[in-house]
Structure formats: structure tokens, C-alpha cells
Amino acid sequence: MSLQADFDQAAQDVRKLKSRPEDEELKELYGLYKQSVIGDINIACPAMLDLKGKAKWEAWNLQKGLSKEDAMCAYISKARELIEKYGI
């Protein structure tokens, strides 16, 4: 399989986890996903009162500078770790 196909499959598989991962795990996965699909963050930081939006922005911003390919590899690795931990 190609890297893109592996990434797409991992993105589908994490939606099927038997239980919800911890918030930190979800934020890391989100940041890697956005970096894989879009690249470096291209939106302004949300207002302080938008806690969920700010957390997502920060998770994506942490991945800034990572190439899309490296982000995909990291996403796949994290997805496999979560699948092993939580099952599908």
C-alpha cells in the first residue's frame, strides 16, 4: 500500500475504536491529521473563551514544520498505537 492509502486506512480505523482515547491522545492525532492533510497551520489562534478550538489549534501548531509525509507516518504510528491500546 502507498503512504496515502495507509494514512486513509488509519484515519478510518481510529473512528472504530472500542473506547474513547484520552484527550491528549486525541489532540495529538488531530494535530498530525491536520498537518498531514493541510500542512503548517494557516489560521489564527481562536479566542481564549473557545477552549476546544484553542486546544485543537495548539495541537496542530505543535506539528508545525513537519512535512506532510512525516506527519502521515507519525499519524499512522499513533493510530496503530491507539488501535492496539483500545481495540477496534
UniProtKB/Swiss-Prot annotation:
For whether the record's keyword set contains DNA damage, the answer is no
Which GO molecular-function terms appear in the entry? fatty-acyl-CoA binding
According to its UniProt entry, one GO biological process term is: G protein-coupled receptor signaling pathway
Provide the leader sequence positions: none
InterPro entries named among the record's database cross-references = Acyl-CoA-binding_protein (IPR000582), Acyl-CoA-binding_sf (IPR035984), FERM/acyl-CoA-bd_prot_sf (IPR014352)
Protein keywords? Lipid-binding
SUPFAM superfamilies recorded: Acyl-CoA binding protein
In what residue span(s) does the ACB domain sit? 3-88
> What residues does an acyl-CoA bind to?
R15, Y30, G31, L32, Y33, K34, K56, Y75
Q: Does the keyword Repeat apply?
A: no
> Where does the source fall among the domains of life?
Eukaryota
Concerning Gene3D superfamilies, the annotation shows: 1.20.80.10
Which family, according to the similarity comment?
Answer: Belongs to the ACBD7 family.
Q: Tell me the function of this protein.
A: Binds medium- and long-chain acyl-CoA esters.
Query: In its UniProt entry, what is this protein called?
Result: Acyl-CoA-binding domain-containing protein 7
- Taxonomic placement: Eukaryota, Metazoa, Chordata, Craniata, Vertebrata
Q: Which gene encodes it?
A: Acbd7
